[in-house]
């Protein structure tokens, strides 16, 4: 029999106050590294200093804006090629570490400080280069450690963006299937199923739930599974359709007016459902959910 082999995260930990147990989590999974380098922002370092002081890092590197050039600049300071990179931050920091790890062929894990998009486990990094947001293919992380209590402290706007990014999988899957019917593009039913299931995982929740541990856990797991769908498809297709193209166009054409990726994607999702998916669409259902 024939099987498809894919890389899946060795570590997936979602829980309260688990970041301080990073070393124990690595040992429990038989992962041993001589050194670890933390990549984060100065703001997060200062905010979570008491927790970070309980962990041992060979060095701490700081990311400000998360541009392509900044990622290369920070990357060039890494001389030890046998370290584990720990990306602690939002999408910009995680995407910068993805590029660094991919270029240097280093192993990395993600520790999201918020859940604004699927950066925590997608094989794609979106970075500002030459004045425009660009996508770069990268390897997925070795693992994800989502500390619910840290994520709870992030602005609600970021969490809502994460919901928008995840729910938009429904639109992406429709576009992928349309390309299959209309253009003969190959599809992966397993990847489509993962993308759909992960997108549906947050539908039962309301705005009042966004600080709850259960919601944070389901959002984190959903974003990871969405990333896994992309890894399985070897493409962003399961989680990126017309709604993402609209968001990318906003970034390209109106860089000074663009906002969070997940919020733009949610708006694009509504636009596509309302104006292009006829005669049947999910526009009314989406409006009720987003309201």
Predicted region positions:
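ATP/NTP phosphate-donor binding region
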Residues: 1-84
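Structural motif
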Residues: 36-37, 83-84, 107-109, 142-144, ...
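Short beta-strand/turn micro-motifs composed of small residues
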Residues: 39-40, 89, 112, 146
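Short glycine/serine/threonine-rich phosphate/pyrophosphate-binding segments
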Residues: 47, 92-98, 117-120, 239
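A short, small-residue-rich loop immediately preceding and capping a beta-strand
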Residues: 81-100, 104-115
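A glycine/threonine-rich phosphate-anchoring loop and its flanking beta-alpha core
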Residues: 103-198
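Active-site segments that bind and position negatively charged phosphate/pyrophosphate groups
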Residues: 189-289
């Amino acid at each position: 029999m024939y099987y498809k082999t894919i890389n899946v995260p060795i570590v997936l930990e979602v829980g309260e106050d688990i970041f301080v147990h990073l070393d124990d989590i690595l040992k429990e999974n038989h992962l041993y590294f001589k050194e670890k380098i933390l990549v984060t922002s100065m703001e997060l370092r200062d905010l979570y200093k008491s927790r970070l002081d309980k962990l041992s890092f060979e060095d701490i590197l700081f990311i400000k804006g998360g541009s392509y050039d900044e990622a290369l600049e920070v990357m060039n300071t890494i001389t030890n090629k046998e370290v584990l990179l720990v990306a602690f931050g939002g999408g910009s920091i995680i995407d910068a570490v993805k590029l660094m790890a991919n270029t240097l062929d280093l192993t990395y894990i993600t520790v999201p400080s918020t859940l604004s998009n699927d950066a925590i486990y997608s094989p794609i990094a979106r970075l500002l280069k030459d004045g425009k947001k660009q996508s770069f293919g990268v390897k997925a992380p070795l693992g994800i450690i989502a500390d619910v209590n840290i994520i709870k402290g992030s602005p609600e706007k970021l969490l809502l963006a994460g919901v928008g990014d995840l729910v938009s999988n429904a639109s992406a899957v429709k576009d992928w299937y349309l390309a299959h019917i209309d253009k003969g593009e190959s599809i992966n039913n397993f990847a489509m199923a993962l993308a759909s299931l992960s997108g549906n995982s947050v539908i039962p929740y309301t705005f009042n739930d966004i600080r709850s541990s259960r919601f944070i856990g389901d959002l984190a797991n959903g974003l990871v599974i969405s990333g896994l769908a992309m890894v399985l498809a070897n493409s962003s297709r399961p989680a990126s359709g017309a709604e993402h193209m609209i968001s990318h166009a906003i970034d390209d054409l109106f860089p000074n007016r663009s906002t969070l990726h997940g919020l733009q994607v949610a708006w694009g999702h509504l636009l596509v459902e309302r104006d292009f998916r006829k005669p049947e669409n999910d526009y009314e259902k989406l409006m009720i959910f987003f309201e």
